[in-house]
Every structure is written in structure tokens, then in C-alpha cells.
Amino acid sequence: MSDTTIAVIIPAYRVEELILEAVRSVHAQTYTDWQIWVISDDATDYERVLGRQGLVDSRLHFLETGAIGAGASVARNLALDAIESRYVAILDADDRMKPGKLAAAHSALAEHPIVSSALDVMDTDYRRLRLVGAGPDRLLTPANYKFTSLSMDSMIVWDRTRCDARYDTSLTNMTDLELLMQLWRTAKTVHHLGEPLHDYLKRESSMSNGEGVTERMVRSKTTLLQRLSQGHYAFADPAATEGLASFLNISLAAEAAYPDALARMPGLLFEDHLEPMLRAHAAA
């Protein structure tokens, strides 16, 4: 297992145009000891797609799920089973890394098992909508992690010798948080990079923002709450359960109120809707 290489996992489902930006963002990293693992989940030959754009590199690896729409969790697990490097990073095919992300993550991984990053939330034209989790670098516990990183979590990097897991293929949403919950069985903290080093693209057709997302989110969050109540995760930090349950309960309340809030304020981001509720809880 390589002690320096960071393997970047990119599941690919109908992203022939968008994936170019994702792969180019890894190519532009100041830290060059990386691999990219593209997992086709739509029978597309992404090696050919990227090659047509001049993206040919021995550090690129390609796998296929053998299905159409098996899901990002299936694709990521396929890569996790194949990768031999110690460090793994997650990158959705419609997102990008800022050039210094892997260097900052690698430096932090010398002392910490998991690294997260502030997000630069963007529209489909790569215009900034807002930042999430920006500020100083800080050490987060499982109990308070989601009160800082209140949006998506598919920007983490982790050390597989200190914590590892596979994605839960039974969940439609919240799979990144659920993976973290597994990692927290042995990892007590997350080192959060306060500089927004990860571009998170908001697309209407994505699993996080598309039609029916509220219903899927509610089901997945409810499932995670049930697991917490049953002691499913046996966290290394005993305080994790209470903090995560608080976040999920607040998030479920936000889901219930979001349709009315969106009707009053068209275009309202869920993050902008949720954040004041989290702050009120933290201040109570």
C-alpha cells in the first residue's frame, strides 16, 4: 500500500461533458502523486472520452460497474476494492478540486485520519452561490462536524490504515455522511480545511438536487436516525451519537419547512435554509 499516493475516485454516470472539468482539476493539483479512478456506470468508455480531449495519463485508471445506473455507491465500492493506495479522496464527476487541495490534505493526513474541506458552492456556469464551512482550519468531532460542514460530504480524504469502510448501497442519499459514520467507528476527529478547496456544482438533475430529492433525503435521514438510536455504529467518540442525532433531527425539520420557504423565496438554497436552524441550536 503506497504511503504517498492519493487515489481520487470519480463515479461516472452520464457525465461525458462534466467529467472533463473534474479530471482537469486533478491534473492541475500542485501535489502530483495521485491516481484517478473513473468508474463508468453507464457503459460509456470514459478512457476514450477523456483521450479525445488529450487527457491521457498513466495515473488514470478505468473500471466499469457493468450496469446502467447501478449508483455512485456501487461504483465507489468497486474502486475501493481495487485501489491499493493508503489515501483515498472522493470527487463527484460534476465537481472540481482547487489546485492546492490534495497538497493540503496530504499534509493534514500526516497527523489526522480524515480531512474535509470547505466548499465553494457553484451553479452550472461555475458562478459562486455561497461558501460552506469557510474559516480557519479546525479539528471537528463527529458530534459537531455537520454543524460546520452542513452541505454535502463527497469531498473527504482519508487514511485507510486508520479508518476504512464501504458505501451503503441500500441508501439513495446521505451515503457520504453514512460512510463517515462508519469511519468514525475508529477515527475520533476530522481535520477540516477552512479554505474552500472543493467546488460543489449544484445541478437540478443530480441525486442531491433533482426531482423527488426531499422524499429521498427524508427516508435516508430517518434511516440514519434509527440506526443511531439502535447503537448501530459503536463510535470511537461516545458523544458522536447525540451530536449526529441533533443534526439529523434539525435537518429533517428543515426538509419539512423547505417547500414553503422555497415558495416564499424562489431559488433559496437548502444550505441557506438550514444554516440558521443549526446556528440557533448551537447557541441554545
Language-model features, listed with the residues they occupy:
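Glycine-rich, basic loop-to-helix element that forms the pyrophosphate-binding segment
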Residues: 65-83
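A conserved hydrophobic helix/loop-capping motif in glycosyltransferases and polysaccharide synthases
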Residues: 6-18, 22, 29, 39-41
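Conserved nucleotide-sugar donor-binding catalytic segment
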Residues: 139-221
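Cell-envelope/extracellular polymer assembly enzymes that use nucleotide-activated donors
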Residues: 4-7, 25, 35, 178
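The conserved acidic donor/metal-binding loop of glycosyltransferases
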Residues: 92-96
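Acidic donor-binding segment of Leloir-type glycosyltransferases
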Residues: 23-66
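Short aromatic/hydrophobic "clamp" motif used to bind/position activated sugar donors
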Residues: 88
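Conserved donor NDP-sugar-binding/catalytic core segment of glycosyltransferases
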Residues: 100-129
